[in-house]
């Protein structure tokens, strides 16, 4: 997947999670008799609200879990793409760099040895 596709999917999933959390908050306000409900409810009305509230809570909770799982998959894909983009594309280039580093180390060792040998009485 391209980066743009992953970012679009991330935006959609985040929006879905946000909406689901809003629905759960509204549902909990309805279930517990929000601030603007001044009328006492009958027992049959409470049972209806409770059973439908449980179903809706379950549905929204499942949506949250699915959304979080999607976010984990998306972020993992983004991290993997980022890590893979950090690796050198050409093995010859990395071999050349390692040979150059090795040559620099050899020069440093040689210079150090000469300095040590020259300083000895």
From Swiss-Prot:
InterPro entries per UniProt: Med22 (IPR009332), Med22_Saccharomyce (IPR016530)
Keyword Nucleotide-binding annotated: no
Gene Ontology cellular component terms for the protein in this record: mediator complex
This protein's UniProt keywords: Activator, Nucleus, Transcription, Transcription regulation
Superkingdom of the organism of origin: Eukaryota
GO MF entries: transcription coregulator activity
Function: Component of the Mediator complex, a coactivator involved in the regulated transcription of nearly all RNA polymerase II-dependent genes. Mediator functions as a bridge to convey information from gene-specific regulatory proteins to the basal RNA polymerase II transcription machinery. Mediator is recruited to promoters by direct interactions with regulatory proteins and serves as a scaffold for the assembly of a functional preinitiation complex with RNA polymerase II and the general transcription factors.
Subunit structure: Component of the Mediator complex.
Similarity comment: family membership: Belongs to the Mediator complex subunit 22 family.
Stated name of the protein: Mediator of RNA polymerase II transcription subunit 22
Biological source species: Kluyveromyces lactis (strain ATCC 8585 / CBS 2359 / DSM 70799 / NBRC 1267 / NRRL Y-1140 / WM37)
Lineage of source species: Eukaryota, Fungi, Dikarya, Ascomycota, Saccharomycotina
Gene: SRB6
